[in-house]
C-alpha cells in the first residue's frame, strides 16, 4: 500500500491493477466468459459516516492503490457485460500477513498498544468470501457488490480489543486518532463502511459476523 506511493513504483502498480486487469477483461470478452474482479473501498474518498453503496459512482481515490484499482474496475465494466466487481475491506486469511497476525505479535511483546479509533469499517475473512464468490460465479446476477463480514461497523481499536479478548491476551489497548498515531505514505480512509444489502437482494448469503469469523480464524493459525 505505502510502497505504491513511491514514484518509482507507480507505473508498476498501474500495470498490474489497471493494465493487467484490462488484458484479462479483453480475453474474457473474446471467450465470452464471466469475470470476477476483487476491488476495494479505496475507490471512494473515505469521508462521511454513511455506508458506501455498491453502485455509487462518486469515485475519489485517496491514493495510488485506490486510483489504480478504480482504473481496473472501469476496465472491467467498460469491456464486459458479464462481470462481478466485488469490493472488500480489512482482509484477513490464513496465508500472508494481515492486521490480526500483526496485532497478535505486537501483543506478545508489549503490555500496551496504541490503535486508531477513527477509521471505521468491517473485516473480511477470505474463507467466507471465497464461498460467496463461488455462489456468485455460478449465477448470472452481474454487477457491483460489497462483501465484508456482517456484525456491525467497528474501528481498528474495536477490532484489536476483540482480537485480544478471543486470544486471551491481557494487553491494554489505547485508542488514538489517526493524527495522533502518525500519517503513513498512503492516506487511509476514515469511512470504510460498505453497504452489503445488495447481496441478500440478489439471493446471496451474506458473510457471517466478523466476531464469528475471527473465532474460526484464530483456530486455524498458530500464535
Annotate each language-model stretch with its function.
Residues 21-24, 73, 133:
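Conserved internal alpha-helix within the Rossmann fold of NAD(P)-dependent oxidoreductases
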Residues 1-16:
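NAD(P)H-binding glycine-rich loop region in Rossmannoid oxidoreductase-like domains
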Residues 29, 60-84:
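Active-site Tyr-X1-5-Lys
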Residues 190-223:
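C-terminal amphipathic/interface module of NAD(P)-dependent oxidoreductases
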Residues 74-121, 127-128, 135:
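NAD(P)-dependent short-chain dehydrogenase/reductase
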